Amino acid sequence: LLPDWETLPYDHFSPHQDLVSERLATLYRISRGECHVALVAAQTALYRLAPQSYLAAHTFFLTQGERLDVDALRSQLALAGYTHVTQVVSPGEFSVRGGLIDLYPMGAALPYRLDLFGDDIESIKTFDADTQRTLYPMRDVRLLPAREFPLDEAGRTRFRSRFREVFEGDPSKSTLYKDISAGIAPGGIEYYLPLFF
Protein backbone atom coordinates (compact mmCIF):
# COMPACT_ATOMS: atom_id res chain seq x y z
CA LEU A 1 0.00 0.00 0.00
CA LEU A 2 1.38 3.40 -0.99
CA PRO A 3 -0.22 5.87 1.43
CA ASP A 4 -1.63 9.17 0.25
CA TRP A 5 -0.19 12.41 1.63
CA GLU A 6 -3.64 13.13 3.11
CA THR A 7 -3.33 16.80 2.23
CA LEU A 8 -4.91 18.84 -0.53
CA PRO A 9 -2.96 20.50 -3.32
CA TYR A 10 -1.63 23.88 -2.24
CA ASP A 11 -2.32 23.26 1.46
CA HIS A 12 0.17 25.18 3.53
CA PHE A 13 1.16 22.16 5.61
CA SER A 14 3.06 19.01 4.80
CA PRO A 15 1.99 15.40 5.34
CA HIS A 16 2.65 13.84 8.74
CA GLN A 17 6.14 12.34 9.03
CA ASP A 18 4.67 8.88 9.70
CA LEU A 19 2.94 8.96 6.29
CA VAL A 20 6.09 10.17 4.53
CA SER A 21 7.99 7.39 6.33
CA GLU A 22 5.55 4.73 5.10
CA ARG A 23 5.62 6.12 1.56
CA LEU A 24 9.43 6.10 1.41
CA ALA A 25 9.60 2.54 2.77
CA THR A 26 7.08 1.38 0.16
CA LEU A 27 8.88 3.18 -2.67
CA TYR A 28 12.17 1.61 -1.53
CA ARG A 29 10.62 -1.89 -1.57
CA ILE A 30 9.17 -1.25 -5.04
CA SER A 31 12.52 0.00 -6.36
CA ARG A 32 14.26 -3.16 -5.07
CA GLY A 33 11.67 -5.46 -6.64
CA GLU A 34 10.48 -6.66 -3.22
CA CYS A 35 6.93 -5.54 -3.93
CA HIS A 36 5.23 -6.84 -7.07
CA VAL A 37 1.81 -5.26 -6.50
CA ALA A 38 1.14 -1.83 -5.02
CA LEU A 39 -2.27 -0.65 -3.93
CA VAL A 40 -2.57 3.05 -4.67
CA ALA A 41 -5.55 5.35 -4.23
CA ALA A 42 -6.62 7.06 -7.47
CA GLN A 43 -5.70 10.50 -6.08
CA THR A 44 -2.24 9.25 -5.06
CA ALA A 45 -1.65 7.79 -8.53
CA LEU A 46 -2.11 11.24 -10.08
CA TYR A 47 1.02 12.71 -8.50
CA ARG A 48 4.51 12.25 -9.88
CA LEU A 49 7.08 10.48 -7.73
CA ALA A 50 10.75 11.13 -7.18
CA PRO A 51 12.91 9.08 -9.57
CA GLN A 52 14.40 5.81 -8.32
CA SER A 53 17.86 7.33 -8.64
CA TYR A 54 17.03 9.90 -5.94
CA LEU A 55 16.04 7.20 -3.45
CA ALA A 56 19.08 5.08 -4.33
CA ALA A 57 21.52 7.99 -4.02
CA HIS A 58 20.20 9.12 -0.62
CA THR A 59 19.80 5.69 1.05
CA PHE A 60 22.69 4.41 3.12
CA PHE A 61 23.47 1.73 5.70
CA LEU A 62 25.37 1.69 8.99
CA THR A 63 26.76 -1.64 10.21
CA GLN A 64 27.99 -2.83 13.59
CA GLY A 65 31.80 -2.81 13.71
CA GLU A 66 32.03 -0.16 10.99
CA ARG A 67 34.26 2.88 11.47
CA LEU A 68 32.15 6.06 11.66
CA ASP A 69 33.02 9.73 11.24
CA VAL A 70 30.36 11.45 13.37
CA ASP A 71 30.76 14.84 11.66
CA ALA A 72 30.42 13.25 8.22
CA LEU A 73 27.33 11.36 9.45
CA ARG A 74 25.75 14.61 10.69
CA SER A 75 26.33 16.19 7.28
CA GLN A 76 24.98 13.14 5.45
CA LEU A 77 21.87 13.04 7.65
CA ALA A 78 21.23 16.77 7.18
CA LEU A 79 21.64 16.38 3.41
CA ALA A 80 19.14 13.47 3.48
CA GLY A 81 16.64 15.73 5.31
CA TYR A 82 16.97 14.47 8.88
CA THR A 83 16.44 16.94 11.74
CA HIS A 84 18.87 17.21 14.66
CA VAL A 85 16.92 17.15 17.96
CA THR A 86 17.70 16.66 21.64
CA GLN A 87 15.45 13.59 21.95
CA VAL A 88 14.39 11.36 19.06
CA VAL A 89 10.65 10.64 18.95
CA SER A 90 9.57 10.75 15.27
CA PRO A 91 10.80 9.40 11.93
CA GLY A 92 13.37 11.65 10.30
CA GLU A 93 15.09 12.75 13.52
CA PHE A 94 18.56 12.14 14.96
CA SER A 95 20.47 13.06 18.10
CA VAL A 96 24.16 12.91 19.00
CA ARG A 97 25.14 12.74 22.68
CA GLY A 98 28.77 11.88 23.23
CA GLY A 99 29.30 8.28 22.10
CA LEU A 100 25.58 7.65 21.54
CA ILE A 101 23.75 8.41 18.30
CA ASP A 102 19.98 8.03 18.19
CA LEU A 103 18.35 7.74 14.75
CA TYR A 104 14.74 7.31 13.70
CA PRO A 105 15.07 6.14 10.08
CA MET A 106 12.24 6.71 7.65
CA GLY A 107 10.37 3.45 7.09
CA ALA A 108 11.46 1.97 10.43
CA ALA A 109 9.02 0.81 13.10
CA LEU A 110 11.38 1.82 15.92
CA PRO A 111 14.29 4.23 16.38
CA TYR A 112 17.87 2.95 16.63
CA ARG A 113 20.67 3.71 19.09
CA LEU A 114 24.28 3.45 17.96
CA ASP A 115 26.83 3.04 20.74
CA LEU A 116 30.29 4.11 19.65
CA PHE A 117 33.60 2.91 21.03
CA GLY A 118 36.06 5.49 19.76
CA ASP A 119 35.25 5.77 16.05
CA ASP A 120 33.72 2.29 15.72
CA ILE A 121 30.06 1.32 15.97
CA GLU A 122 30.18 -1.06 18.93
CA SER A 123 26.46 -1.86 18.99
CA ILE A 124 23.20 -1.02 17.25
CA LYS A 125 19.94 -1.49 19.16
CA THR A 126 16.35 -0.47 18.67
CA PHE A 127 14.78 1.52 21.48
CA ASP A 128 11.42 2.71 22.72
CA ALA A 129 10.93 6.40 21.85
CA ASP A 130 8.75 6.98 24.94
CA THR A 131 10.87 5.31 27.63
CA GLN A 132 14.22 5.66 25.80
CA ARG A 133 15.07 2.07 26.86
CA THR A 134 16.94 -0.13 24.42
CA LEU A 135 15.10 -3.16 23.07
CA TYR A 136 16.69 -5.44 20.45
CA PRO A 137 20.23 -5.75 19.11
CA MET A 138 20.59 -5.27 15.35
CA ARG A 139 23.46 -5.85 12.91
CA ASP A 140 22.76 -2.80 10.74
CA VAL A 141 20.39 0.06 10.09
CA ARG A 142 19.01 1.32 6.76
CA LEU A 143 18.59 5.09 6.43
CA LEU A 144 16.22 6.26 3.70
CA PRO A 145 16.04 9.96 2.83
CA ALA A 146 13.76 11.92 5.17
CA ARG A 147 11.79 13.57 2.37
CA GLU A 148 10.72 12.81 -1.17
CA PHE A 149 12.67 15.68 -2.75
CA PRO A 150 16.28 16.93 -2.61
CA LEU A 151 16.96 20.18 -0.80
CA ASP A 152 20.69 20.18 -1.53
CA GLU A 153 22.22 22.90 -3.73
CA ALA A 154 21.61 20.96 -6.97
CA GLY A 155 17.96 20.31 -6.05
CA ARG A 156 17.39 23.96 -5.12
CA THR A 157 19.01 25.11 -8.38
CA ARG A 158 16.73 22.80 -10.43
CA PHE A 159 13.70 24.01 -8.45
CA ARG A 160 14.54 27.70 -9.07
CA SER A 161 15.13 27.12 -12.78
CA ARG A 162 11.90 25.18 -13.28
CA PHE A 163 9.93 27.59 -11.08
CA ARG A 164 10.95 30.46 -13.40
CA GLU A 165 9.92 28.37 -16.45
CA VAL A 166 6.49 27.45 -15.05
CA PHE A 167 5.40 30.56 -13.15
CA GLU A 168 5.19 34.08 -14.54
CA GLY A 169 6.32 37.20 -12.74
CA ASP A 170 9.21 38.05 -10.47
CA PRO A 171 10.19 34.89 -8.53
CA SER A 172 11.91 36.98 -5.83
CA LYS A 173 8.43 38.08 -4.71
CA SER A 174 7.36 34.47 -4.09
CA THR A 175 7.71 33.27 -0.50
CA LEU A 176 7.95 29.68 -1.76
CA TYR A 177 10.81 30.56 -4.12
CA LYS A 178 12.68 32.48 -1.41
CA ASP A 179 12.22 29.69 1.17
CA ILE A 180 13.53 26.98 -1.15
CA SER A 181 16.44 29.23 -2.19
CA ALA A 182 17.34 29.54 1.51
CA GLY A 183 17.14 25.75 2.02
CA ILE A 184 13.86 25.88 3.96
CA ALA A 185 11.14 23.35 3.11
CA PRO A 186 7.84 25.22 3.56
CA GLY A 187 4.63 23.36 4.38
CA GLY A 188 2.95 21.84 1.33
CA ILE A 189 6.14 21.77 -0.76
CA GLU A 190 5.46 18.13 -1.70
CA TYR A 191 3.01 19.25 -4.39
CA TYR A 192 5.86 21.06 -6.15
CA LEU A 193 7.93 17.85 -6.29
CA PRO A 194 8.17 17.80 -10.14
CA LEU A 195 10.10 21.10 -10.01
CA PHE A 196 12.95 19.36 -8.13
CA PHE A 197 13.62 16.72 -10.83
List the predicted regions and their residue ranges:
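ASCE RecA-like P-loop NTPase motor cores
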Residues: L1-F197
